[in-house]
Amino acid sequence: MKKAEMGRFSISPDEDSSSYSSNSDFNYSYPTKQAALKSHYADVDPENQNFLLESNLGKKKYETEFHPGTTSFGMSVFNLSNAIVGSGILGLSYAMANTGIALFIILLTFVSIFSLYSVHLLLKTANEGGSLLYEQLGYKAFGLVGKLAASGSITMQNIGAMSSYLFIVKYELPLVIQALTNIEDKTGLWYLNGNYLVLLVSLVVILPLSLFRNLGYLGYTSGLSLLCMVFFLIVVICKKFQVPCPVEAALIINETINTTLTQPTALVPALSHNVTENDSCRPHYFIFNSQTVYAVPILIFSFVCHPAVLPIYEELKDRSRRRMMNVSKISFFAMFLMYLLAALFGYLTFYEHVESELLHTYSSILGTDILLLIVRLAVLMAVTLTVPVVIFPIRSSVTHLLCASKDFSWWRHSLITVSILAFTNLLVIFVPTIRDIFGFIGASAASMLIFILPSAFYIKLVKKEPMKSVQKIGALFFLLSGVLVMTGSMALIVLDWVHNAPGGGH
């Protein structure tokens, strides 16, 4: 349900052709026709952000003549909004429940502003560096190390996005089947076991779609994802006024104990005191606990869209950096409001009882609810069809790294696809909660893509500004902030894992 696949996009027509005198750095060349690119912009899936276009292997050099963009301002806003929003929205209420309303709004504001600033750095670097490819900017800045850092970060982000989608299948599909079959006792039924269902969906639906050599109609699923999330937000707001408070804590705790699909540690504080009107239904504005550390990575994970910015920029009609920044400002502000409303109303519905995946929390209280069942079906369809879109760039990166000089082979193509899907399924089965995926990927790959790489590329490639300039000093502080956020978040998350491991909290 999100972020398109990483990018070997067609090169911007106004690039310096001398920068591409050799094609030895890449084994793929990319189509520069507007029609080829435009037809794939619905493919930008928000949680991954790197859409790989089909390559033209016979081409020796990038096209350098000017090709004006053809995508309108409004459609560019939609494309970028679609690249931002994704499964991360399901974890925002959990983040608010562990930070408090005021602290969450402060963090959300800072992360959105920093993400927008990194888009500014990225656009300026692309203009000065003469490339609209994220990996190529890395190569121009730091050689092979920079290229691998960009490619690795985007691949990790894609794997995290894919895992989060399969986690949603693991969480929600058993509830849908249980609601449709009216089964009360699901003990021992394999078709109500989330792990079995993830494997089944992967084999029957995702694998066949992932074996295609091109995306075709799958590219349009990201648009469906955005619509599903808007529908989800409307339902979250409506349900706030239907779910009674205080929430029946015993019911939630029983549901948590009886299922492996919830986050046990999220409910521990609720066990230590009686649930009363003043206690359970009072919002908190500042909260600090062991789960607060996940808030920033979840927010960072939710705002990653940066590898999608460059191809959207290339296709923008009347293209200019100022115009693209206006597109970015509108998109980020719209997603800021959407994230804030989803987190706020989700939190004000369940307070400290919010689980790490908000949609699953409703089943503990409302059981079989028709409206929620429709939301679940829509979200399940969107994420299931989006996973094959996410697999494309990962497979292409692996192929490019290991077998760049070899001709296409269906056996190799299939083996890499199966391996990627198998690895992701293992993560989903053995990683206890979606919160861990949001936290780890948000703290590592997403921090690289938002903070570290854009600022490092800017410092290295924008030559006309001296290091003592305000712009370069700002980029340097941004880089150091990213390193601090990444190392600090990762350290605290690992400490939380170690601390909770003996008690089975993870």
From Swiss-Prot:
Pfam families: Aa_trans (PF01490). It comes from the Eukaryota. Na(+) binds at N82, T386. Glycans are attached at N258, N274. Keywords: Amino-acid transport, Cell membrane, Disulfide bond, Glycoprotein, Ion transport, Membrane, Phosphoprotein, Sodium, Sodium transport, Symport, Transmembrane, Transmembrane helix, Transport, Ubl conjugation. Ubiquitously expressed. Expressed in neocortex. Widely expressed in the central nervous system with higher concentrations in caudal regions. Expressed by glutamatergic and GABAergic neurons together with astrocytes and other non-neuronal cells in the cerebral cortex (at protein level). One of its GO terms (molecular function) is acidic amino acid transmembrane transporter activity. Polyubiquitination by NEDD4L regulates the degradation and the activity of SLC38A2. Inhibited by N-methyl-D-glucamine. Inhibited by choline. Allosteric regulation of sodium ions binding by pH. One of its GO terms (cellular component) is cytoplasm. It catalyses: L-alanine(in) + Na(+)(in) = L-alanine(out) + Na(+)(out); glycine(in) + Na(+)(in) = glycine(out) + Na(+)(out); L-serine(in) + Na(+)(in) = L-serine(out) + Na(+)(out); L-proline(in) + Na(+)(in) = L-proline(out) + Na(+)(out). The chain crosses the membrane at residues 77-96, 103-123, 159-177, 189-209, 218-238, 293-313, 330-350, 372-392, 414-434, 437-457, 473-495. Induction: Up-regulated upon amino acid deprivation. Up-regulated upon hypertonic conditions. It is found in: Cell membrane. Residues 1-76, 124-158, 210-217, 314-329, 393-413, 458-472 are cytoplasmic. Disulfide bonds join C245-C281. Residues 1-96 are annotated as: Regulates protein turnover upon amino acid deprivation. Residues 97-102, 178-188, 239-292, 351-371, 435-436, 496-506 are extracellular. Symporter that cotransports neutral amino acids and sodium ions from the extracellular to the intracellular side of the cell membrane. The transport is pH-sensitive, Li(+)-intolerant, electrogenic, driven by the Na(+) electrochemical gradient and cotransports of neutral amino acids and sodium ions with a stoichiometry of 1:1. May function in the transport of amino acids at the blood-brain barrier. May function in the transport of amino acids in the supply of maternal nutrients to the fetus through the placenta. The extracellular C-terminal domain controls the voltage dependence for amino acid transports activity. Belongs to the amino acid/polyamine transporter 2 family. This is Sodium-coupled neutral amino acid symporter 2. It comes from Homo sapiens (Human). The gene is SLC38A2.
